């Protein structure tokens, strides 16, 4: 299977969107993305998937835009040009003497803007496909070169006639007016913890004291408070959640005085902070000396970038090798992790 579509929803309703997409009568796999309100669909081909969407449109309540994907590449201007050339050559008989527009939806941080890329690609197509007698028309075009960028990944399609993105206006209207849930849907951070609880339920059994490092805005603390008698949420930032058993230590983790601020044996340590890998690990290890024997640590390794992920993991593992009573139980790539993240489950022996 390959990426065949991006499907958008109102941010916060990704779990509901995933559930309804999973019910579609087609072989597929639904993936989370690092971007709120966007899921990626893997299947056999985008044309078949789009037809299935149209046939089952009335059963979809959380799908807003369905964007078919024909070809993927790295987010590099030259790679994008190659992918577009491939598609144009494949469809050139249908594109002769037509007008076109280039549209880019860019998500993430890049050295170029969406508008700059649209201009670069437009000029490239005109220069390299003169034999097709193409012309640019920003409003009344015959086909659209559509570029969807998700940080390091880019997806290109040529929309024409019936093959086009599908916008479900009724759902946009309904979701806009939808009353908020009494308890809001899970965000990506909470989905990570939910997945951990489902995969490793024994870690969360009979726990009294949890220390959650870098807790703000409180997603992990909220979920842990339902399993533990007490959660110490360590962060200078505000918590967006409240529970009688959540104790907010409003300090930087490195400034916490354990005897004064906690002073009890820890059953579980969690850390999902946005810090450099080694810096974050040393904070976890600071509290590990107060972790009970056979207690677990859940630590998110956040690499500096995708290219340094292996190097950052090796650095963290080297640091851990000096702590003989802290053993690696599992290194896992959760569905809700970003591409730069790995989840380390450690155990004190």
From Swiss-Prot:
The lineage of its organism: Archaea, Methanobacteriati, Methanobacteriota, Methanomada group, Methanococci. Signal peptide: none annotated. This is Uncharacterized protein MJ1257. InterPro entries: RNA_MeTrfase_FtsJ_dom, SAM-dependent_MTases_sf, THUMP_dom, tRNA_sulfurtransferase_ThiI. SUPFAM superfamilies: S-adenosyl-L-methionine-dependent methyltransferases (SSF53335), THUMP domain-like (SSF143437). Residues 51-160 form the THUMP domain. PANTHER family: TRNA SULFURTRANSFERASE. GO terms for molecular function: methyltransferase activity; RNA binding. It comes from the Archaea. One of its GO terms (biological process) is methylation. GO terms for cellular component: cytosol.
């Amino acid at each position: 299977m390959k990426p065949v579509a991006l499907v958008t929803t109102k941010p916060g309703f990704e779990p509901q969107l995933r559930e309804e997409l999973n019910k579609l009568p087609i072989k597929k796999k639904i993936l989370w993305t690092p971007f709120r309100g966007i899921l990626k669909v893997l299947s056999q081909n985008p044309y078949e998937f789009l037809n299935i969407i149209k046939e089952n449109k009335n059963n979809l309540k959380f799908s807003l835009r369905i964007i078919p994907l024909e070809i993927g590449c790295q987010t590099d201007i030259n790679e994008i040009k190659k992918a577009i050339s491939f598609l144009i050559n494949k469809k050139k008989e249908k594109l002769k003497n037509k007008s076109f527009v280039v549209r880019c939806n860019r998500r993430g941080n890049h050295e170029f803007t969406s508008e700059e890329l649209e201009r670069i690609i437009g000029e490239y197509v005109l220069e390299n496909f003169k034999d097709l007698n193409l012309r640019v028309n920003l409003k009344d075009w015959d086909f659209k070169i559509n570029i969807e960028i998700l940080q390091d990944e880019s997806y290109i399609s040529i929309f024409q006639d019936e093959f086009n993105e599908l916008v479900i206006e009724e759902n946009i209207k309904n979701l806009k007016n939808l009353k908020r849930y009494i308890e809001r849907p899970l965000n990506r951070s909470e989905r990570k913890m939910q997945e951990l609880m489902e995969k490793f339920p024994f870690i969360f059994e009979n726990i009294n004291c949890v220390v959650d490092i870098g807790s703000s805005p409180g997603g992990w603390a909220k979920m842990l408070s339902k399993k533990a008698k007490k959660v110490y949420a360590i962060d200078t930032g505000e918590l967006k959640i409240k529970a009688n058993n959540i104790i907010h230590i409003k300090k930087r983790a490195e400034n916490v005085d354990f005897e004064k601020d906690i002073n009890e044996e820890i059953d579980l340590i969690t850390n999902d902070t946005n810090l450099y890998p080694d810096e974050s690990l040393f904070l976890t290890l600071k509290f590990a000396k107060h972790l009970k024997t056979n207690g677990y640590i859940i630590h998110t390794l956040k690499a500096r970038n995708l290219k340094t992920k292996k190097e950052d993991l090796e650095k963290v593992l080297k640091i851990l090798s000096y702590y003989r009573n802290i053993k690696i139980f599992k290194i896992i790539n959760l569905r809700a992790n970003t591409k730069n993240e790995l989840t380390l489950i450690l155990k004190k022996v």
